[in-house]
From Swiss-Prot:
It comes from Acidothermus cellulolyticus (strain ATCC 43068 / DSM 8971 / 11B). This is Ferredoxin--NADP reductase. The keyword Flavoprotein applies. Homodimer. Its cofactor is FAD. Coiled coil: none annotated. SUPFAM superfamilies: FAD/NAD(P)-binding domain. Binds 1 FAD per subunit. InterPro entries: FAD/NAD-bd_sf, FAD/NAD-binding_dom, Fd--NADP_Rdtase_type_2, Ferredoxin-NADP_redctase_2. One of its GO terms (molecular function) is flavin adenine dinucleotide binding.
Amino acid sequence: MLIVGAGPAGLYAAYYAGFRAMSVVVLDSLTEPGGQLAALYPEKVIYDVGGIPAILGRELAADLYKQAMTYNPVMLLGHGADQLFRLDDGSFLVTTTTGLLIHAKAIIVTAGIGVFTPRRLPVGQEYEGRGLRYFVPNPQELAGKRILVVGGGDSAVDYALMLEKVAASVTLIHRRHEFRAHEASVEQLRASSVRILTPYQVSAVYGDDRVTAVDVTDHDTKHVERLDVDEIVAALGFVAELGPLAEWGMELRQRHIVVDTTMATSVPRIYAAGDIADYPGKVKLISVGFGEAAIAVNNAAVAIDPSKKLFPGHSSDPDRHPTER
């Protein structure tokens, strides 16, 4: 079984496929497990996972990874899925962006929103990695620094609130008067010590080896203010695309993969689960992705070996646990 994507749905699918005594390979172009959860929202509190009143994104990602490793899947992080070749027996050969070749009897695509790349700050791109960043996986790296956050969506506001706890100072600029972020988060922002500048944009970036200052320009008055900063966190949104997956022959709908009630795609033995899967009434929640992953794995198991039962029993029943793989 090949699982493409190591986000929440993919990690749970890896666990469940192991529970069903399948050999599992997990691919993800990101170098850390957890998908968007770990890359974009590590310090965001998640409240809507059943049985867990509240948990940080990075903690949930770590727990899912630990659970996924129960049956020792092969975890190939930093390797993106590339070309797909179907063999005469119905199985597949998949090449990776790093040159690996994987043989799979079935595939589950749990690629979230696909390959996502941050929208670049229009100025100062030469400082990327030297004071300009687009992700904050570890806020402690910015402890004691003067931070400028750029953006008006949920990520920007979340980053500003997260970094307020550790930074020397945080300034948030947005090119519009109104924020796109969740109303409750914006209220929390306005009650915080974060300095808010709207409607401002970064017009110039200064520095030597690293960023030292920026000019920000008021969109309405054209007033320019220079800010001394140590780090710029640009949270301007992301451009998402399916990448090579779009060429695999699956029916697509608005960059999502169309599935039926078994999570099967239009290509036999390829399934999809999580945010990338689309069907009438779809709701994009982590908890929904878990259920879709289990449905996909169980149906894939039967597609590979029709003698297997669709429902394998409960994990709490000791004699239902697989002893051989």
